């Protein structure tokens, strides 16, 4: 039996935004919740800057790469929650694991409002099921995930052999996984596969140009 034809016209994958050092360091940068509470499981200040800047990247009021689309469906890795912990302003449990991906897309989701469908049901390790769900979405999809597992997601996407996907998430000069790129997959109905490209965000000072 042949695989079903994907419905998602565009799939855009990003890593969550910047985080504090691991293990948490005594000096800054610290992780902070949206209300400014120190929390090493949250984004750093630079991470929140990127999360805000991504709104205009994906929902532009100015020209951006034409291949970038305003997402209609947004996936972020499931938060490892603890029902006894309080929620922050975004509605995520304070002190829980995995929240940075949801924090990264929160400003985008707020801007889009009810026009976007959010899915936080899939955990790390559920990449195959998650991308199968994403490819069945009838419109542009944005996925925010932990960078170590993004190649697992990409490996499940049928990609044109002329645009192969790297085996690992790109690193900066220090060997750390980059925060400033988008992996873009555009569906080619004639080939029933996706064309892959690597798009730099170029949002913050220090972002790499390619």
Positions of PLM-derived features:
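Active-site-proximal alpha-helix that buttresses catalytic centers in soluble enzyme cores
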Residues: 3-138, 149-210
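Mobile, glycine-rich extracellular loop/lid and propeptide segments
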Residues: 141
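Short beta-strand segments
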Residues: 144-146
């Amino acid at each position: 039996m042949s695989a079903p034809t994907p419905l998602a016209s565009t799939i855009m994958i990003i890593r969550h935004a910047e985080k504090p050092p691991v293990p948490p360091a005594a000096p800054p940068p610290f992780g902070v919740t949206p209300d400014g509470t120190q929390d090493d499981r949250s984004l750093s200040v630079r991470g929140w800057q990127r999360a805000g800047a991504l709104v205009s990247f994906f929902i532009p009021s100015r020209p951006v790469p034409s291949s970038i689309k305003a997402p209609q469906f947004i996936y972020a890795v499931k938060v490892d929650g603890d029902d006894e912990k309080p929620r922050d302003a975004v509605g995520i449990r304070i002190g829980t694991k995995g929240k940075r991906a949801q924090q990264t897309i929160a400003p985008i989701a707020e801007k889009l409002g009810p026009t976007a469908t959010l899915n936080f049901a899939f955990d790390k390790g559920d990449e195959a099921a998650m991308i199968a769900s994403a490819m069945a979405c009838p419109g542009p999809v944005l996925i925010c995930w932990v960078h170590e597992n993004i190649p697992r997601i990409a490996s499940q996407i049928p990609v044109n052999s002329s645009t192969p996907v790297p085996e690992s998430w790109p690193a900066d000069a220090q060997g750390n996984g980059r925060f400033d790129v988008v992996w873009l997959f555009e569906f080619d109905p004639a080939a029933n596969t996706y064309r892959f490209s690597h798009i730099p965000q170029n949002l913050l000072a220090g972002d790499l140009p390619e």
